[in-house]
Amino acid sequence: MALLQIAEPGQSPQPHQRRLAVGIDLGTTNSLVAAVRSGLAEPLADGDGKVILPSAVRYHPQHVEVGESAKLAAASDPFNTVLSVKRLMGRGIADVHQLGEQLPYRFAAGESHMPFIETVQGAKSPVEVSAEILKTLRLRAEQTLGGELVGAVITVPAYFDDAQRQATKDAARLAGLNVLRLLNEPTAAAVAYGLDQKAEGVVAIYDLGGGTFDISILRLTGGVFEVLATGGDSALGGDDFDHAIADWIIQQAGISSDLDPSAQRSLLQAACAAKEGLTNADHVELSHGDWRGTLSREQFEALIEPMVARSLKACRRALRDSGVELEEVSAVVMVGGSTRVPRVREAVGELFGRTPLTNIDPDQVVAIGAAIQADTLAGNQRGEGEELLLLDVIPLSLGLETMGGLMEKLIPRNTTIPVARAQDFTTYKDGQTAMMIHVLQGERELIADCRSLARFELRGIPPMVAGAAKIRVTFQVDADGLLSVAARELGSGVEASIQVKPSYGLTDGEIARMLQDSFQNAGDDKAARALREQQVDAQRLIEAVEAALQADGERLLDAEEREVIELQVQELRDLLASNDGLAIERQSKRLSQVTDAFAARRLDSTVKAALAGRNLNEIEE
């Protein structure tokens, strides 16, 4: 008799078999794939034994080349070789023009202002280019592990916004990968170090890669990784070090900065080689065309000092946001190839007062942490006592527009995700049957100073007096940091929703600027918000009084009384355009006082009309 093999939902019917899942570090300069094998997370090598895959894609008429060979062809075939595509993920064509010289490609605008790179195979989007890198890593993993993958955890900078995260997920799907989760790169590093060293306390993750910088302050307690605060710069990395050296060479050689793409590639390759050489040497020899020169480590450190200072400023801001003092930080983890620069390690050590941890290869630590998380999400059993919980946070507050152009925050920045928050709102005018929901991101009090994410309309609200309808708006951020918003009128049940997928992301430095502006303008913003609220309340009062005058003015007021009220209404209306909040408040009170008697008469009239023709017994019943 045959036996029916059964298993608990979500478990393998053969528990000794592990589901194959990987962690992928999709980097600006280099990418890696790692997996847990025999209980240890390790990067997976290609056929030549190399674990690092340069994030370079070269397009030929009939095929695509990815990795080291593509990178080497960048100087000879710059238009068909795409480097640092991560900088373009989720960006718009306007952002591309701002990057200018750093991107020697031929661009064309596509749908929703998405930039496309012109190649011999036609126009390619950043998502398609990234998909080629991910596809190469997927094939490497499947060949090494000997089977198909159930999914992958892909890391992204903590500062990636919704558009950039969605673009990453789209690239993964195009590459044939099931995304188990998008994981913030600093959090992935914490996973790797937390499991290896059983660390507890407050840890700073300093992540300086090729194109982005992230700083995260985490509290590690009993296997729980809680991100207290994040910060960074979406346009700061090792590529900027290369450009600093390239600019120095141009100045020293006395040549024009207006180089053709091939010469620009050659110059940047020479600059990158010099940067790497100065990690262990005191000076390096350089050449460009007929020029020969020497760059010392001291000169190099002077060139990059402003960039290092920018990263340290972000560190101090993240510490302030987390409420943690410098002396409370028990460890500093270095992540990213650019942290090999001696001056970077020295400056970070000086700031935190301790030697940074570099136990795990800074190029590999993120992929290793992602592999550990992927192994867990795939359902593979962990060893006893190795439970793992990750608590990421959102980098900027999320909210919506209210009357007066005000930003009402529903989810404050640094809130742990996944999260859902709801708040009730109401209508502003009598008979209002629709409401525009304007979703915003930012720290300022006025919508003009925040970033618009999306708009959608809730229709079918039953007509009723202003303030009677109750509309519940729910914001939900999933584990990948993607936002969905729903609005529902509680009485009728009508609802509308939207998943926020902006057509392109924030411009370079915009997130950092938004945070900095919020700190610098906090006092002014509160005053401006108070003024707007007073103006909205005053406008509502004016509309209510005018509606009452139109309905009952002739019947309940004599000419003199009506003239007094209308005069006070006009004075308040004249004040609305001013910035004198105190005067608006005083005049609103004055108008309320002069209409008290009118309001009482209207109430009496309404009660009399309701009781007319009815006896006492009917009323008591």
From Swiss-Prot:
Highest taxon, organism lineage: Bacteria
Keyword Nucleus in annotation: no
Alphabetized HAMAP family for the sequence: HscA
Taxon lineage: Bacteria, Pseudomonadati, Pseudomonadota, Gammaproteobacteria, Pseudomonadales
Pfam families: HSP70
Name of the protein: Chaperone protein HscA homolog
Keywords: ATP-binding, Chaperone, Nucleotide-binding
Family from the record: Belongs to the heat shock protein 70 family.
PANTHER family xref list: HEAT SHOCK PROTEIN 70KDA
Gene3D superfamilies cross-referenced by the UniProt entry: 1.20.1270.10, 3.30.420.40, Actin, Chain A, domain 4 (3.90.640.10), Substrate Binding Domain Of DNAk, Chain A, domain 1 (2.60.34.10)
GO biological process, one term: iron-sulfur cluster assembly
Presence of keyword Chaperone: yes
Alphabetical list of InterPro entries matching this protein: ATPase_NBD, Heat_shock_70_CS, HscA_NBD, HSP70_C_sf, HSP70_peptide-bd_sf, Hsp_70_fam, ISC_FeS_clus_asmbl_HscA
Transmembrane segments: none
